[in-house]
Design a protein with these regions (language model features):
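N-terminal anchoring/stem segment of glycosyltransferases
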Residues: 1-52, 73-74, 127-129, 133
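A short, glycine-/small-residue-rich helix N-cap motif at loop->alpha-helix starts
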Residues: 17, 56-63
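Short amphipathic alpha-helical segments and helix-helix/interface helices
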Residues: 19-25, 68-69, 168-172
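A structural signal for short, well-ordered beta-strand segments and their strand-loop junctions
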Residues: 33-36, 80-84, 106-107, 181-186
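An acidic/histidine-cluster motif and surrounding catalytic segment
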Residues: 44-58, 141, 148-151
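GT-A fold catalytic core of metal-dependent nucleotide-sugar glycosyltransferases
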Residues: 60-107
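Short beta-strand-to-loop element that shapes/binds the nucleotide-sugar donor at the catalytic cleft/hinge
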Residues: 104-130
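Catalytic core and acceptor-binding pocket of nucleotide-sugar-dependent glycosyltransferases
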Residues: 133-248
């Protein structure tokens, strides 16, 4: 049975893999919406770029939240899911039950390196109030509380380590939820098929440049560090791994 909650994407430019993602996610969701648009003065006027990735790219990663918020407020949508354009849901779960009383349930690695500071929205379940709270938090940090971001950025500069401050950093500081999609009941959501880490470091067995995945009765499993099969409820074809999406 398909989910009654809508699934949102944010994709301001044309990319070939979006259509494949939409095609596959239509198996799980009745309603899929692609939000576009890049104008967001309330954010752009306060943003301070502290990242080795491009300014334009990092701005869009933040702007997506404001654009989706505008749409759901105008259309009276109280609960929804979001995924990146290179992410695929594999199973229709009871997303409302997972959300319960939380403002948001996202992907927060239990084990993180020094100044990694990430919580990902690439698979996430939201309430309207939760998204509005997060957008307000972003504005407040860049306006009044930017000091909480500086230690991480200074570490990147001093160590000449790539990355920096991004939307996942702000979400890391904002996110107070007790739930974690990497710790879903009965399985997990994927951080990225090109990395062994998920909730913890070196969590999954690799085959070449991607996680070793098995299709058992039309369900996708990975093998964890305890040699146990773990079902994936969603796969993230991040970076140069997007071509693997076409194998589903």
């Amino acid at each position: 049975m398909k989910s009654n909650l809508p699934l949102f994407y944010y994709q301001p430019n044309d990319v070939p893999y979006l259509e494949k993602s939409l095609e596959l996610n239509k198996r799980i969701f009745k309603d899929l919406l692609v939000i576009k648009g890049t104008d967001c003065p309330e954010f752009n006027n306060v943003y301070k770029h502290m990242c080795y990735n491009s300014d334009a790219f990092e701005r869009l990663c933040f702007i997506r939240f404001f654009k989706i918020l505008k749409y759901i407020k105008e259309n009276n949508i109280d609960k929804f899911l979001y995924c990146d354009s290179d992410a695929i849901f594999l199973k229709a779960l009871d997303f409302e039950k997972i959300l319960q009383d939380e403002k948001c349930v996202a992907c927060r690695p239990k084990e993180q390196n020094k100044f990694e500071d990430v919580t990902g929205a690439h698979f996430s379940i939201w309430t309207k109030d939760g998204l509005e709270d997060f957008c307000n938090y972003i504005i407040d940090v860049y306006t009044n509380n930017i000091d909480i971001l500086l230690p991480k950025w200074e570490w990147h500069v001093e160590t000449k380590t790539g990355g920096g401050i991004c939307d996942m950093t702000l979400m890391y500081h904002w996110y107070k939820g007790k739930k974690n999609l990497y710790e879903a009941i009965g399985g997990t959501f994927d951080r990225g098929i090109g990395m062994p880490q998920n909730n913890i470091a070196d969590e999954f067995e690799m085959k070449g440049d991607i996680k070793r995945l098995r299709n058992i009765d039309n369900q996708i499993f990975g093998t964890n560090y305890n040699d146990e099969l773990v079902e994936f409820f969603g796969l993230h074809f991040q970076g140069d791994k997007k071509n693997y999406m076409y194998n589903l």
